[in-house]
């Protein structure tokens, strides 16, 4: 189900949190439907930043739909590394779209474990793992019957009956978008563009 259609104003993920300079990251897992329906490519997001400013490299759709898709659909032992996703405002007016709560056990904070809260309409843009995400979408479309396997793929024993937990690393920059601490300055946004290019 898409995040925009869910009842609560937020969706929560259990995550491990860390910092790398001005970047805070949250390591978590998403079920496959959440990943393919809610993580977007930069060119799918409406906004003031151009595609060339936001994306790392041009997608090779053929590679994603053949080589990587066959890796997923032909079974056996397989694993994907994390997809790296930056959390950004979905519009110039949106200033708050994420927060986190520390996890406690017996009244004590469990170091680095948090509950990540993502608010509706946050832009979740893949910055590393674009080809993996594209192949996961193709797999999901075959799994749900939206885009059936071809006769040749069936002959080659492709199967899309299994679902996966997708490892994801969410990135946020400083307090941009954090509830109660949102900084919507253009300077921070410009730094984000530069950081996601590297």
Language-model features, listed with the residues they occupy:
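N-terminal extension/subdomain marker
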Residues: 1-123
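Basic- and aromatic-enriched surface patches that contact anionic nucleotides/nucleic acids
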Residues: 79, 89, 98-198
């Amino acid at each position: 189900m898409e995040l925009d259609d869910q009842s609560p104003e937020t969706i929560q993920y259990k995550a491990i949190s860390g910092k790398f300079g001005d970047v805070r990251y949250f390591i978590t897992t998403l079920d496959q439907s959440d990943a393919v329906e809610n993580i977007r490519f930069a060119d799918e997001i409406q906004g003031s930043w151009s595609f060339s400013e936001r994306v790392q490299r041009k997608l090779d759709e053929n590679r994603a739909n053949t080589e990587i898709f066959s890796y997923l659909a032909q079974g056996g032992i397989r694993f994907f590394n994390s997809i790296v996703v930056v959390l950004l405002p979905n519009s110039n007016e949106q200033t708050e779209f994420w927060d986190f709560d520390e996890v406690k056990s017996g009244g004590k904070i469990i170091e680095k474990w948090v509950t990540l809260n993502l608010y509706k309409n946050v832009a979740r843009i893949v910055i590393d793992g674009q080809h993996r995400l594209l192949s996961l979408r193709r797999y999901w479309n075959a799994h749900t019957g939206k885009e059936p396997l071809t006769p040749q793929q069936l002959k080659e024993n492709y199967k899309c009956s299994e679902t996966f937990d997708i490892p994801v690393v969410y990135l946020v920059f400083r307090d941009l978008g954090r509830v109660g601490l949102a900084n919507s300055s253009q300077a921070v946004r410009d730094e984000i563009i530069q950081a996601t290019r590297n």
